[in-house]
Amino acid sequence: LEMTDDVLPEGMEILHLEGHAMDMVGFKVGNVAYIGDAVSSREVLDKYGIQYTWNVGDYLESLEKLKDIDAELFVPAHVAPMDKEELLELAGYNRKVTAEIIEKVQELLAEPKTFEELLKEVFDSYEMAMNVRQYALIGSTLKAYITYLKEAGKITYMFEDNRMLWKTVQD
């Protein structure tokens, strides 16, 4: 069953907020918008520096979409409910952190690196300890950033000694 407004109970509206997770949605009921993981708290972003993201471009678009949601109260999944002004401030902070990660990946790729080398440098940069869970979460997030940057023409790849290397494109 495809998730569309016509399959929802009357008075409930679907909010397409892809990016943090594939096909992520929120719901609006009356003047309340339930926005799931569309934003992360300052505390989480400050503590970890990098959060799981499925698709960076979609995530940035969803942060912009939040501006257009007509609601009085916004209920994120892991943050206290807030008004629109607070939401827009937090969305701006999420956007800032995402831009910093984009910049960090480009800086780390000033010299060609394999994905594994880049992943290690990301872990070192954010002072994280690698384990299986973090390898999977941050590894897939890093691949989302690589995809975003490659599609934007900001990084490129090459093959050398049977290894795929990523490198920032010099302007």
Residue ranges and their predicted role:
Residues 1-8:
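Active-site HxH/HxHxD metal-binding segment of metal-dependent hydrolases
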Residues 9, 29-31, 161:
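Residue-level signal for tight coil/turn positions that link beta-strands
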Residues 1, 66-70, 154:
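A structural motif corresponding to the C-terminal end of an alpha-helix
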Residues 107-171:
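C-terminal regulatory/interaction regions
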Residues 13-18, 22-102:
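Metallo-beta-lactamase
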